[in-house]
Amino acid sequence: FVNNNIIDKNKLKQIIEKEKDLDIYLKEENNEIELNMYLLDICPEYYVLNNQKHINRDFKKITFVNDDYEYSATMLDKNELKYSLSINYGNNLFEGGSGTGKTTIMLSRAIKLARVYPQHRFIVFVSSKKLCNQLKEELEILYKDNNNLEIHTLSSFLFKLAKKFDLIADYRMFKQDYEKYLNNLIKQARNVIKNKNMFKGIFIDEAESFKVEEIEFISEFLYKTKNILDIYYCNALNITNDLNIFKSRDDIKVNQKIDLDINYRQDKNLIEFINRFCQNSNDYIKTLRPMIKNDIYVPTKSIYNQGQDPEIIKVIDLEEQIESILWEIDFLRNKKGLDYSDIAIVYPYNKKKLKNGKTIYFQYILRKALEEAKIPYMVAEDEITNITKKVGITISNIYGIKNLEYKAVIFCELEMLYNQTIGDTKQDYQINDFVGDLNKIYLAINASTSYLKIITTFNEDSSEIIKILIKSS
């Protein structure tokens, strides 16, 4: 293919000097599949794997087999490509809503630099084991000769340092008090590892889930000069206990800020609904705290067709909610032609203790209902990623669904969220906790690419969250 289709400088010289005829290269159209496979081989950083949407229409989607598993690859959009083609030294902040390609751009830039500078080391940090697993799998396919690009969570990186530098680390204690022992390892690392300048480039995805102190610690491992620190951020996706809407992150100094607003994930109608949710949420927060100048939720722009309007379905009780879930599954399968693997059922928590002392085990109730209906399902554990071959419907709490996307999401049992209303609007912590639950809503509704069904027993009078959702529909 290269010999017949690529003109290098030597062949160009022969053509100019008329030693070769240009017509031999123009005798027929290029085979687009062969051309795409060639580009995937020589510049894999410009491709995204198993994307549900076909982004760049100038290049066909290609499929290939790796280790007995079939993958698809599509070329990045031209707006994504420009951030991979031009990379500046210094601290770069990429900020954008869910679906704007932050992780895709991050991995593309990381692979690009690692291939350009094979003598230097680079590292990617993510907040979840799930995304870490996915990016490692993508890296194995896209960067086959990799020996200088690592992917870690902060804890896995610290465990690696502990093993290498004989730090005191009791792995069992992490399960008892994660924060305490993570901070202990960070202190040890600072004291023991004097020369921490290990990496030419560091990439922090999901930076909203990292503390400022953790980002500062990570950045200490950069070279002193000619380094690259990329930070990818969306405040609305912060569902950690460290969320503080009253605290600015301006103390993280950046040389360049890039705002991402093109939504590569979702259909137009769904994006418009989410944009209204963003606007209504921002307005509500600012009526309570006008001093909050920056929007927590940012709108995105659609590049796809209309799609389906999201639905909010009101039911009477838990039993009717389960019946509605089963009905929606049947509708999506038989009327919309979706496979079970295209559908996710999302709920806030696996279980919740009620005020009367009883505990509702929602995941157990849901699993039992699916089994009785003979509907195959799988639970969204850390090993389940966007690349994983799925068997059946995915069921997940709000933490398991992060980093996953499906054609259809059935979001139910919103009643489990603790902050349906703000009891005392004078209390900052109550407003902060309410925003934390709004963030959980934002995360769940953004897991869908086309169909969104929200099922609830609450109405506008009993829940400010439901009021915002209904106002957005």
Give the role of each language-model region.
Residues S72-A73, K78, K82, Y89-D145, ...:
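Conserved helicase motor core of SF1/SF2 NTP-dependent helicases
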Residues V65, I87-Y89:
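A mid-sequence, solvent-exposed acidic-amphipathic segment
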Residues E19, D23, Y46, N50, ...:
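Short, flexible helical or helix-coil boundary motifs
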Residues N51-L76, E95:
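Conserved adenine-nucleotide phosphate-binding loops and their immediately adjacent elements
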Residues F165-F221, T394-Y399:
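Conserved RecA-like ASCE ATPase "motif II neighborhood" in helicase/translocase motors
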